[in-house]
């Protein structure tokens, strides 16, 4: 039995163009846990997840109501919202397949540095697209807006996490044979100030935070489940090539060359690199359907020391 941290991608709950209601997300969560049940049952497993669409929806709901919530509060709300979906879905799969482990949703805080350069240059998009006619009103909320191909989106700081506060509770649960569901949306961003823990407006990259948690837990493996089977070099070009098993120094070279796109594969590769550099045995990047095959070395990208 090994210890593994699995970071679920957005497609574990939603697909592009689908309605974002409870029923759709619950249905996808059921399928997710069916697919990964052999991994969770046979290994010490921690599951993390993103919250990009959901935290944007929460912020939009507050925008419509006229009662604005701080961004760190919205991240906390998304952890409860998504945690309920995933926990209920797991318990249904557990009952159907007579699985032995219980799942626990952990409201998780990630400590960041108030002086992180990310606060001076917000870059992480959240929420819906805004038209040229709507953008001025959005800016009146104090939001930083950025023009993308399909319209304007709000962008927020995405600082580097430096500590996962609930790590000891997560460690205890996984050691006792349970499945902690943690670091939702990268964790609630907080800073330590004068003996207090204070929320700060940001959204932390969930893969980077999951990698940090995996290192803190001394996990053997770290797996990022996304919507593609492998990491590619020269992606989208005639000579694009999937990466299979690759050593740390090789993928660091590709990373330095700028082979991986900002906001999509780049943070995933960086998270995997961080984990292996911090003592992990291997990091995997693949799609949901190939998670088990990747662990056996038969699919996906596997980064080793």
Curated annotation (Swiss-Prot):
Transmembrane segments: none annotated. GO terms for cellular component: cytosol. It is found in: Cytoplasm. GO terms for biological process: arginine deiminase pathway. GO terms for molecular function: ATP binding; carbamate kinase activity. Its main location: cytoplasm. Pfam families: AA_kinase. It is an enzyme of class 2 (transferase). The keyword Transmembrane helix does not apply. SUPFAM superfamilies: Carbamate kinase-like. Belongs to the carbamate kinase family. This is Carbamate kinase. It comes from Thermoplasma volcanium (strain ATCC 51530 / DSM 4299 / JCM 9571 / NBRC 15438 / GSS1). The gene is arcC.
């Amino acid at each position: 039995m090994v210890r593994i941290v699995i970071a679920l991608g957005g497609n574990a709950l939603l697909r592009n163009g689908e309605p974002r209601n409870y029923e759709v997300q619950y249905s996808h969560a059921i399928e997710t846990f069916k697919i990964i049940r052999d991994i969770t049952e046979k290994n010490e497993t921690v599951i993390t997840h993103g919250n990009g669409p959901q935290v944007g929806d929460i912020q939009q709901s507050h925008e419509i109501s006229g009662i604005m919530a701080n961004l760190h509060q919205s991240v906390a709300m998304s952890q409860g919202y998504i945690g309920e979906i995933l926990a209920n879905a797991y318990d249904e799969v557990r009952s159907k397949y007579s699985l032995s482990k219980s799942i626990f949703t952990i409201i998780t805080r990630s400590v960041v540095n108030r002086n992180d350069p990310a606060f001076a240059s917000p870059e992480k998009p959240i929420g819906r697209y805004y038209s040229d006619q709507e953008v001025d009103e959005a800016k009146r909320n104090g939001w930083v807006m950025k023009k993308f191909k399909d319209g304007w989106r709000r962008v927020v700081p995405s600082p580097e996490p430096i500590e996962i506060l609930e790590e000891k509770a997560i460690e205890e649960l996984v050691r006792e044979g349970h499945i902690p569901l943690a670091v939702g949306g990268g964790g609630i961003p907080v800073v330590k100030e004068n003996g207090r823990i204070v929320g700060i407006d940001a959204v932390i990259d969930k893969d980077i935070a999951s990698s940090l948690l995996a290192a803190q837990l001394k996990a053997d493996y770290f797996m990022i489940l996304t919507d593609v089977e492998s990491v590619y070099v020269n992606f989208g070009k005639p000579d694009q090539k999937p990466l299979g098993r690759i050593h740390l120094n090789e993928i660091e070279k590709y990373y330095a060359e700028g082979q991986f796109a900002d906001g999509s594969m780049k943070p995933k590769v960086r998270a995997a690199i961080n984990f292996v550099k911090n003592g992990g045995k291997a990091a995997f990047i693949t799609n949901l359907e190939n998670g088990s095959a990747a662990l056996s070395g038969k699919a996906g990208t596997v980064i080793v020391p």
